[in-house]
């Protein structure tokens, strides 16, 4: 169970880092938002899911 928690935390950190860089780039590009809207929403949904997964796994470990 600890390995799953560590992998979920790593995935959350990696997703956060990717979104931290990619979202401003999408908003700064001239036609970025209209062409990359689905990618931003998918990344945000993945991030929210990982936050809940880390919370659930943390409650099971502690």
Swiss-Prot record:
Its main location: plastid. GO terms for cellular component: chloroplast thylakoid membrane; photosystem II reaction center. The keyword Transmembrane applies. Pfam families: Ycf9. The chain crosses the membrane at residues 8-28, 41-61. Keywords: Chloroplast, Membrane, Photosynthesis, Photosystem II, Plastid, Reaction center, Thylakoid, Transmembrane, Transmembrane helix. InterPro entries: PSII_PsbZ, PSII_PsbZ_sf. One of its GO terms (biological process) is photosynthesis. It is found in: Plastid, Chloroplast thylakoid membrane. It is a multi-pass membrane protein. It comes from the Eukaryota. HAMAP family: PSII_PsbZ (MF_00644). PSII is composed of 1 copy each of membrane proteins PsbA, PsbB, PsbC, PsbD, PsbE, PsbF, PsbH, PsbI, PsbJ, PsbK, PsbL, PsbM, PsbT, PsbY, PsbZ, Psb30/Ycf12, at least 3 peripheral proteins of the oxygen-evolving complex and a large number of cofactors. It forms dimeric complexes. May control the interaction of photosystem II (PSII) cores with the light-harvesting antenna, regulates electron flow through the 2 photosystem reaction centers. PSII is a light-driven water plastoquinone oxidoreductase, using light energy to abstract electrons from H(2)O, generating a proton gradient subsequently used for ATP formation. Belongs to the PsbZ family. This is Photosystem II reaction center protein Z. It comes from Citrus sinensis (Sweet orange). The gene is psbZ.
């Amino acid at each position: 169970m600890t390995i799953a928690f560590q992998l979920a935390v790593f995935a959350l950190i990696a997703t956060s880092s990717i979104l931290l860089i990619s979202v401003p780039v999408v908003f700064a590009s001239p036609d970025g938002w209209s062409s990359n809207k689905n990618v931003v929403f998918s990344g945000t949904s993945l991030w929210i899911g990982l936050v809940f997964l880390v919370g659930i796994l943390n409650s099971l470990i502690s």
